[in-house]
A protein has these predicted regions:
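Secreted, disulfide-rich extracellular signaling modules
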Residues: 2-9, 13, 18-474
Length: 474
């Protein structure tokens, strides 16, 4: 049976290898025109532009802190955060607060790690941040903080690469940390020390609304803050076998997922930056985060429909009605070439190399952009497609970098609509992706608009970006 099957396949292969029919009409010598399968390859030109999203929803995995100045713009990032209350905890009756310290741990930085930045911290004294509300990076600080209630004794000068307050984690690795002492004579210290018990988070938020953390010196470093905590050191005494015994203890208040944290990002002269970038569109487009500057790509859907259906004529009836084959887009490969990947040593980095391309870029329908993130949707082949920065080689063996997207399913659906638009506008957006693994399958479980610092320079549509299509009909 196996030998017989092999013989049949071998004969079929010989027949196919001897066939000289045009690939656009495979098998046309065997089928009538109405029964033939049509396969066509085409390339369609595109247009691209940059768009300013003004602000993005602040929902980062880590918080940015600092200021950075490059040709991709100058921005300053600071943090508004609540602290989680240890619900149900109360200090011992005779406890006395000795000191309060603020800590934050950072896992990386962007820019010049040897350049100093000065950190200031203030108490939030305006509106209470709402845990159930989404905030954008252009949050109005004046509604939440007057900057009249400093928390620290002095500004804290930090050099990111020196890791002055590093601690060892469970794996034995040193984790960079910054320790800042509160001013024990401040109104903040007196009021916080007077809070003796902690009932609910809501009650605590009314007594202590949170912290505003900013830098007011340095424009060459932005720190990726991973964790923020405030430690209250206190002592109390008790009688033990007739002897007065003193115990030193501490209670830690964390900024975590149980409270609201907002990253405010301010771009200086952003409109001028947008104009400068748009002036370069003959060769390049840009996607810059957290600026919210994205690139849009217009797909010529109407032109595609007309071209595709010109190859799909099945038959013409006596009354002049034309019957068409049902079209399928088998392959629609969009490649986005990236042109600013730095591959040298860190010592050779220039200021404009600090911002590197986003590792993950999503191509989403522009009309669905806001809804996608507001409703925490997941990518699918008909609305949003995720691509990773990929390395390849050119014909000379030199490294090239790109994102790749297969739009076959999306275009098949769009081309079958009754009213096909002239163009379909798509948007390139940097995203952070979370995955989940079930048995042997890994799936995307969440997608958030990335707030990490990145700048992606791509070849523009005017500089040769195109869409390659292979489509068929039967």
């Amino acid at each position: 049976m196996t030998k017989k099957l092999f013989l049949i396949l071998s004969i079929a292969a010989l027949v196919l290898s001897g066939c000289k029919d045009d690939i656009t009409h495979v098998g046309s010598g065997l089928l009538t025109p109405s029964d033939s399968i049509v396969v066509v390859a085409d390339t369609f030109p595109l247009t691209s532009d940059i768009v300013n999203s003004e602000a993005i929803v602040s929902n980062p995995d880590s918080m940015l802190l600092g200021e950075l100045e490059t040709d991709f713009g100058t921005f300053k990032a600071d943090i508004l955060t609540q602290l989680a209350c240890p619900e149900g905890y109360a200090y011992p009756d005779n406890a006395k607060v000795d000191s309060i310290a603020l800590f934050f741990q950072y896992n990386s930085w962007v820019g010049d790690g040897s350049s100093p930045l000065a950190i200031s911290v203030y108490e939030l004294d305006g509106e209470v941040l709402n845990y159930n509300r989404s905030y954008t990076t252009d949050i109005d600080l004046s509604r939440y903080c007057s900057k009249t209630k400093p928390v620290l004794r002095n500004k804290r000068l930090v050099v990111a690469s020196e890791k002055m307050d590093s601690v060892q984690n469970a794996s034995g690795d040193y984790v960079p940390m910054v320790r800042m002492m509160s001013d024990s004579t401040s109104d903040f210290f007196r009021r916080f020390a007077a809070i003796r018990s902690f009932t609910t988070q809501e009650d605590f938020n009314q007594q202590f609304k949170g912290l505003f953390i900013e830098t007011d010196f340095g424009s060459s470093t932005v720190i990726n803050v991973a964790d923020i905590a405030m430690a209250v050191y206190y002592h109390f005494s008790y009688d033990k076998a007739g002897r007065d015994t003193t115990v030193n203890d501490m209670k830690v208040f964390y900024a975590n997922s149980e409270v609201r944290m907002v990253n405010r990002v301010q771009y200086i002269d952003k409109e001028d930056l947008e104009n400068q970038l748009r002036a370069q569109q003959a060769e390049h487009n840009f996607i810059i985060s957290p600026a919210g500057i994205h690139t849009t790509i217009d797909l010529p859907i109407k032109q595609m429909e007309q071209t595709i259906y010109s190859h799909m004529v099945e038959t013409e009836l006596e009354d002049g009605t034309i019957l068409y084959k049902r079209p399928y887009v088998n392959l629609a490969q969009l490649r986005i070439d990236v042109e600013n990947v730095f591959s040298g040593s860190s010592s050779d980095m220039k200021r404009n190399d600090w911002l590197q391309p986003a590792p993950v870029m999503m191509l989403v329908k522009d009309a669905s952009f806001e809804r996608f993130f507001a409703k925490n949707e997941l990518p699918d082949d008909t609305c949003a497609i995720v691509g990773s920065l990929t390395q390849g080689t050119d014909s000379l063996g030199n490294p090239v970098y790109y994102y790749s997207y297969d739009l076959a399913t999306l275009l098949t659906k769009e081309l079958r609509k009754d009213d096909v638009p002239e163009t379909l506008k798509m948007r390139l957006v940097p995203v952070s992706v979370t995955t989940a693994t079930t048995s042997s399958t890994t799936v995307i479980s969440s997608v958030k608009q990335s707030q990490s610092v990145s700048a992606t320079v791509i070849r523009s549509a005017q500089s040769g970006m195109s869409l390659q299509l292979v489509y068929s009909g039967f």
